Amino acid sequence: VPESFQKLIRDCKIGNVILFRRNIQSAEQLRELCVFLHCLISLETGLPPMILLDEEGGTVSRLGELGSVSPSAMAQGAAGDPENAFQVGRMLGQELRAVGVNFNCAPILDCNTNPKNPVIGVRSFGGDPEKVADFGAAYARGLREAGVIACGKHFPGHGDTETDSHLGLPVVN
């Protein structure tokens, strides 16, 4: 961890950190990084830190080959049983906890309602709001059972846009 970032944590009392693929080299390195951050943040703030990762499973996996291959949310939704989403959430949660991550930026709670949407697609449990809610809640329960906080995303309606939100501002009419 760069000294400049450690100083930022000390001076600004930063309590939460999000990690990206570029921060991950191996399971052992990630575990050591999370332990270091946990100790530093706890010491400097007196609070337990949240160490975040964006690990949806399916096509969005920051763990990459370090984690298990899991079905996309759309595949889970197509299978028709929210228990599958619970099991995937729990499995991913266990893998995240094993390396020290305690907060997951998942599941996707948006509905995939526009076939021209370049972002949501198979990352959504489907196009029906009730189905997406049921599967998303099951996935989140699986994460929680593994000791990981779930954070549903994206902004409601994103699944009905035609713009990649990483490249431009999506608009829903």
Label the model's feature ranges.
Residues V1-G15:
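Preference for extracellular/luminal or secreted protein segments
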